[in-house]
Amino acid sequence: MSSPERDEGTPVPDSRGHCDADTVSGTPDRRPLLGEEKAVTGEGRAGIVGSPAPRDVEGLVPQIRVAAARQGESPPSVRGPAAAVFVTPKYVEKAQETRGAESQARDVKTEPGTVAAAAEKSEVATPGSEEVMEVEQKPAGEEMEMLEASGGVREAPEEAGPWHLGIDLRRNPLEAIQLELDTVNAQADRAFQHLEQKFGRMRRHYLERRNYIIQNIPGFWMTAFRNHPQLSAMIRGRDAEMLRYVTSLEVKELRHPKTGCKFKFFFRRNPYFRNKLIVKEYEVRSSGRVVSLSTPIIWRRGHEPQSFIRRNQDLICSFFTWFSDHSLPESDRIAEIIKEDLWPNPLQYYLCREGIRRPRRRPIREPVEIPRPFGFQSG
């Protein structure tokens, strides 16, 4: 082609993008394709060994124009088969394919080699991507191993022995039943507390009226104590005389019945001690141990009672010793008898004067083992 032909209608990119064989072999930025090796150099593979990676066809146009401008010449035209190859749209497609292969093989670094080696890059791209995928999969495996080592991922044993299976089958129903039983017990406790508060208010009214009447009966509590088949053994010497000054007895449970109870003995003025109120309290601590506390008795001079009375080589506890000595083995038993037997109905023991018993609609209560509501253990 001549320069007038370019001016008449030949597209600029098609004419200016062509170069002759010398330009192709000497340009560092241009790598001939496999189909144009012989057409460009005529020397086979030896003439194009060491050519660097190709660039865009469009990128060659400004370089050729700049080189021609420096030399003062017009851009050279390419003739022959090479020109046909360059002009055809197939070259553009091949250039685009080469550019796509280069972008895929960009991460895989290789030294410049032969055209065959450069062509193999596009073929190696697929295995290279597989290698990259394999490398990316390794951290996932390491994470799984770390999770398994830390106990995050555990596989259930495929075959569990019948022994472990039997234990689980026996344990789970028992746990479920126990949970249901605990729920029922909690509901019962709440209902009991509600009823206790409701009927406690009703009982309080009658107890106040009963105490008011008993205060006007001289020696009521002394008679009730002496007529009780179990408490009468403790009334010794001056105990009966001191009990004559008891005006009122109150037994109160603490906030919750299982936490203990309190005994209050009210006295009128007497020649034996100065106290008008003596309190004996049993309290259940958080550890489960039951301890007893009492008010110290302020004895008048010369009226300190004997702590123990020896009879038949046995130690017998005095009633007033029960207030001060908390280590006596019978101390807890006395508290139970007063709370569970004497206090609910003292009238039945008051009416038993000197063994004379009134006819009753029910049999007389015999001395029996009274269950301990909260397990007294003095400390």
UniProtKB/Swiss-Prot annotation:
Post-translational modification (record): Ubiquitinated by the CRL2(APPBP2) complex, which recognizes the Arg-Xaa-Xaa-Gly sequence at the C-terminus, leading to its degradation.
Region: Disordered, residue numbers: 1-58, 97-134
Cross-link Glycyl lysine isopeptide (Lys-Gly) (interchain with G-Cter in SUMO2) mapped to chain: 109
Known tissue expression: Highly expressed in testis, ovary, liver, spleen, brain, kidney, prostate, lung, and heart. Low expression in liver.
GO biological process: nucleosome assembly
Compartments it resides in: Nucleus, Nucleolus
MF terms in GO: enzyme binding
InterPro entries: NAP-like_sf (IPR037231), NAP_family (IPR002164)
An example Gene Ontology CC term for this record: nucleoplasm
Key words, A-Z: Isopeptide bond, Nucleus, Ubl conjugation
Residue spans of biased composition, Basic and acidic residues class: 1-21, 28-40, 97-110
Similarity comment text for this entry: Belongs to the nucleosome assembly protein (NAP) family.
Name this protein carries in UniProt: Testis-specific Y-encoded-like protein 1
Species assigned in the record: Mus musculus
